[in-house]
Amino acid sequence: MAAPWLQRWRGAYAGPSGPLRLVRLHGVQRSSWRAAHAAAGAFGAGPHPGPPQRAANPGPGPHPPPVATSREKHARIVQGRPDQPAEPKVLRISIIGAPNSGKSTLSNQLLGRKVFPVSKKVHTTRCKARGVITHEDTQLIILDTPGLTSPMKAKRHKLEAAMLTDPWDSMKHADLVLVLVDVSDHWTRNSLSLEVLKCLSQFPHIPSVLVLNKVDLLKKKIILLGLINELTEGIVNGKKLKVRSEFEYNSSSPAKTVLKVTQTPPPENRARESPCQLETDKAQEGSSLDNSSDVKASESSLDTEAREQKPYKYGDQKNRKGWPHFQDIFMLAALNGEEVDTLKQYLLMQAKPGPWEFHSRVLTSQSPHEICDNIIREKILEYLPLEVPYGVTQVTELWEEGPSGELIIVQNLVVPRKSHKLMLIGRRGALISRIAQEAGQDLMNIFLCDIRLKLKVEVKS
Ligand SMILES: Nc1nc2c(ncn2[C@@H]2O[C@H](COP(=O)(O)OP(=O)(O)OP(=O)(O)O)[C@@H](O)[C@H]2O)c(=O)[nH]1
Ligand SMILES: [Mg+2]
C-alpha cells in the first residue's frame, strides 16, 4: 500500500483572521477500475467471466451510475429533465494543463469510473467531454479537455481544430478551473506553459486551483516546495507565501515529515499574520529525507516575504513563469488515487446553489459509441508508434444486444498501409487480441454488462 505521505495545502485556511489548522491527510486505496485482464481469443474478446453486477436501481449513491449501451437511451437520459433536489448545488470544473499532465486520469478518478481515454502518448484526448458527479444535493460537472497546445504545434502534428479551441471553450462554462502540472517532467514543471498562462489571463475572474500531479514519481518530495513557489510566483489567495520545511523524527511515534507553509498577509494585514501548517507522514521510500536520528532540522527555507511582489500584467505572459492568483494548491497522484478524494471533497464544498444540469443517472455526456471509439483508440495509442494510431479510421459495423443480454460490438480498423495492418495485428494476432481484450474489459466496467468486442483490421482500398 502506498505510504500515506501526501498532503494538501489550502490557502483558505490561512485567511488574515483565519484559524491555524494542522492538516493531516491520508492517501486513498488504489482504484479498482484497472482490472486484471484474462487471456483472449485471437482477434476478439469473448464474454468476460464475472462482470460487475448492474445495480438493481442505478442512480445517486456511493457508486457511479453505468453508461447506457444504447445511443438513444443514453441521449434520453442526458437530455432528460434533471431530478433536482430541494436545494440543488452545482459546480462546473474545467481541467486544463499541458498534454499528458494527467487530466483524464484525474477526471476518471474523480468520477469513480473510467470513461475518458488515458495513455502515455500526448494528445490522447481529442475534444472536450463532460463527466458528472452527483453527490447528495451537489452536482459537479467535470470538463476534461485536450492538452493545451500552440497553433504551431497543432499544425505540425496535424491536430484537429477542436484540440486548440476546446480548452478555451470549456473555460467559458467553468465556475472553477483546475490547472494540472506534471511534477515528474523536469523540462516543464518549473513554469506554467504559455498556453496555460494565456488561458488563465483570458479568464482571470474564474477561481483557479493549482494541482501538482504525479507526485508519486518524485524521489525528492522537497522540490515540491520550490515548485509551488515558482508556479504561484510566491502568492496564493492574495497572500505571499513563506515556504519552509522541517523534518522531524520522533522515536516514540512513527517518523514523519512536517512541511510548513507560512503565508504573509498583504502589508496592511501584517499585524494579523497567520501561518498555515501542513503535516504529512514521512516521505516514501527513495526520498532523500534523513530520518535516521532523533533530530529536528530545518532542511530548506524559501522565504518569499522579502521578494518584491510584481503586479501581474495580463498579456505579459511571455516573461512569467507562474500565476499569482491561485486560490488553493493540491498535491496528488491521480494514477493511484492518492489525495483525489480530498480534492473531491474540496470541490463539493465549492459548489454554489444552482440547478443541476443533468439527471443524477448521467455519468458522462459522451455517447456509448464515442466512449467505445476512445477506449479502443487509447489501446492503439498505448501499444503502437504514433504514426499508426494517427492513421487509423474506426468504423463500427455492429452494435447490438446479444441473446444473453451481452453487448456485441464489431469494429473495423481501417489503416492506410499494409505495414500498419501487420503492426496492428501483431505476431499471430497477439496485439489485436490484447487490444480487444483490454478495451472489452474497460467497456464492461463502463457499461456494467458483458461485452463481446471483435476488432478487424483492413487496409484502405
Ligand atoms: N505515475 C503517475 N502517472 C500518472 C499520474 N497521472 C497520470 N499518469 C499517467 O500519465 C499519462 C498521461 O495521462 P492522461 O490522463 O492521458 O493525461 P492527459 O493530460 O489527459 O493527456 P492528453 O489528453 O494527451 O492531454 C498516462 O500514462 C497516465 O497513466 C500519476 O499521478 N502518477
Ligand atoms: Mg486526456
Curated annotation (Swiss-Prot):
Residues 89-354 form the Era-type G domain. InterPro entries: G_ERA_dom (IPR030388), GTP-bd (IPR006073), GTPase_Era-like (IPR005662), KH_dom-like_a/b (IPR015946), KH_dom_type_2 (IPR004044), KH_sf_prok-type (IPR009019), P-loop_NTPase (IPR027417), Small_GTP-bd (IPR005225). Residues 144-147 are annotated as: G3. It comes from the Eukaryota. Residues 123-127 are annotated as: G2. Residues 97-104 are annotated as: G1. Its main location: mitochondrion. Residues 332-334 are annotated as: G5. Residues 285-303 have a biased composition (Polar residues). Pfam families: KH_2 (PF07650), MMR_HSR1 (PF01926). The keyword RNA-binding applies. Residues 39-73, 260-319 are annotated as: Disordered. One of its GO terms (cellular component) is mitochondrial matrix. Residues 213-216 are annotated as: G4. PROSITE patterns: G_ERA (PS51713). One of its GO terms (molecular function) is GTP binding. Residues 1-35 form a transit peptide. Residues 269-284, 304-319 have a biased composition (Basic and acidic residues). Residues 380-461 form the KH type-2 domain. It is found in: Mitochondrion matrix; Mitochondrion inner membrane. One of its GO terms (biological process) is ribosomal small subunit assembly. Probable GTPase that plays a role in the mitochondrial ribosomal small subunit assembly. Specifically binds the 12S mitochondrial rRNA (12S mt-rRNA) to a 33 nucleotide section delineating the 3' terminal stem-loop region. May act as a chaperone that protects the 12S mt-rRNA on the 28S mitoribosomal subunit during ribosomal small subunit assembly. Belongs to the TRAFAC class TrmE-Era-EngA-EngB-Septin-like GTPase superfamily. Era GTPase family. HAMAP family: GTPase_Era (MF_00367). This is GTPase Era, mitochondrial. It comes from Gallus gallus (Chicken).
